[in-house]
Amino acid sequence: MVVAVMAPAAVAQVGYEPTEENLQAREAFRDSGFGIFIHWGVSSMLGRGEWVLNRDDVTLDEYERLAASFYPSRFDADAWARAFKASGAEYITFTTRHHDGFSMFATEQSPYNIVDGTPYGRDVLKELSQACARHGLKLHLYYSHLDWRRDDYVPLGRTGHDPGRRSDGRWSDYLAFMNAQLTELLTGYGPIGAIWFDGLWDRDEQPGGMDAELWQLPQQYAMIHRLQPACLIGNNHHVTPYAGEDMQIFERDKPGENTAGLSGQAVSALPLETCQTMNDSWGYRITDDNYKSSDELIRYLVGTAGRDANLLLNVGPRPDGTLPEKAVKRLADIGAWMQTYGATVKGVRGGPVAPHEWGVTTHRGRTMYVHVISDSTDDAILLPYTAAKPVKACMYDSREAVPFTVTPAGIVLRLPAAAVPDRVVELTFKTNI
């Protein structure tokens, strides 16, 4: 075997110099390892996912009427925060406004929001912000660049072509609307860990449709960094990061993979994050019971950490404000695993050995964690690492010594059998890796 060392590609951030606060926030973000994505809004009432307005036989007029009946009477921000914190997550990313244009916070920019446009009348984002502060979670905010409703989102892209939709507004008005809402979010809800943009890809078939200047991204990003210098900016545009972005996002794939067809871009030197669903849906879909097993999700988390990325795992709450029972069970199972193994996927960095068929590695200081996550029953693996010799090897959980042999090809580890989703070997070296 050939030694494989992880080496992310560099991405030029021309014209953008992050502040010291921002650089520190990036490292804190990398340390966090695990976050919870929350896709929730009026679309949950139909139980057909967050894209129902674009994909199903629902007109814009019919969809807008949903708000008049949206009343999540069982929403409990503290219950959510407790479940998320117990899972081992360090932050949440909440959908403040998805592509349907409905705002899940108190905004003066449009009456189409949860406070002014529903009988519920409560600012769920404010309640979540306060609950996150109480339970030690950082708050990140999802915000859609794409809008399927407003008449000033012009020209239309490849989605949101409702037959009755008007598109005779001014693009400059839409840009001003977004910046006004972002200002509200960054000045009214305490410290925000990141703004998570989505939807730029809607214009990817138009010449220049994703140009930063068309969207005035330099001005928008500068405004965000001015309002909260430590706030990171990520954009799920499925291309290499633009100047002003502080993290790189991968959708439904770990960095370096592209099984979903959305993540073919080069892996940058920025902090990395992979977003993934528990079942097959982002927003609540009543018929989607295809949940990944707890072991599968744990292995996905480990595989993401081994690629030096965070995992942002999605939950789609029901219209009454509760979390689906299977989602709660998965969170609890991940949390139980984190009680023992959390230190091997949080506060670490991926590598130094690239992912292999048997699993991945993470490291901190002079310690390397070898995560064996394959279903193979082999009791020996070759770790193709020749930069240094370990002085000690043991199973992370039991501290049982692991016999090892140093060869020209690397380190051969002989593992005890164990019925766990991730067998973790701790290797100690004389100096930092």
Residue ranges and their predicted role:
Residues 1-2:
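Sec-dependent signal peptide recognition
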Residues 7-8:
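N-terminal signal peptide c-region/cleavage motif recognized by signal peptidases
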Residues 13-433:
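Mature catalytic domains of secreted/periplasmic carbohydrate-active enzymes
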